[in-house]
């Protein structure tokens, strides 16, 4: 289990949903830290160099080479797994009202903030500023892990809890992500589920 200190605070951006975004990535102790890296639907996090190979990872959702992820048994109507499904890394590790954001909630963040590339304590990243109340939240550039290699460029990657659905929910192997690159946030981006990305938890007062 990840220590609760990993996400002990949140930022109120005044979002219409009432959702509150954690100040730190899951497993991080301050906003500029990367925290842990996760494959999608897997609750066990890893750090670069610990020997874990994401290419050989066993994703939480049952998988077969023929049928892919049998996701329909685990996902809600919007193709996101519920906080209590056992596959939400934020809810599993932090408990309480913490969970992973859905793709819709990432889009809500985009739609109600401005963003700029900046540096905080020597760490490059993206600062979002609420257009509603002026509060800010920082996402550090952390890269991602492919197999065992940490690849760091100028992009921010973060998992959502939402499967990328393209007609047959049982054969999908990608999930939606938060992605900043080329001086803008990228709507509707998705990635193969076995890459290692950080997670930024959200605090859901309704839970």
Q: What annotation goes with each model-predicted range?
A:
Residues 8-9, 14-207:
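C-terminal, surface-exposed recognition/capping segments
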């Amino acid at each position: 289990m990840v220590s609760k200190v990993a996400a002990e605070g949140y930022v109120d951006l005044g979002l219409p949903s009432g959702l509150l975004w954690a100040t730190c990535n899951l497993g991080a102790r301050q906003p500029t830290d990367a925290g842990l890296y996760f494959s999608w639907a897997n609750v066990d996090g890893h750090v670069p160099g610990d020997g874990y190979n994401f290419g050989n990872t066993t994703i939480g959702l049952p998988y077969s080479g023929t049928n892919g992820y049998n996701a329909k048994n685990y996902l809600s109507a919007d193709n996101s797994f519920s906080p209590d499904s056992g596959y939400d890394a934020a809810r599993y590790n932090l408990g309480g009202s913490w969970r992973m954001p859905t793709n819709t909630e990432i889009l809500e963040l985009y739609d109600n903030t401005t963003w700029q590339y900046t540096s905080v304590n020597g760490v490059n990243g993206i600062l979002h500023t609420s257009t509603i109340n002026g509060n800010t939240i920082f996402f550090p550039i952390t890269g991602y892990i492919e197999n065992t290699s940490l690849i760091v460029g100028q992009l921010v990657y973060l998992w959502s809890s939402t499967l990328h659905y393209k007609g047959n929910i049982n054969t999908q192997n990608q999930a939606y992500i938060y992605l900043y690159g080329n001086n803008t946030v990228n709507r509707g981006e998705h990635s193969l589920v076995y890459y290692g990305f950080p997670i930024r938890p959200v605090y859901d007062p309704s839970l």
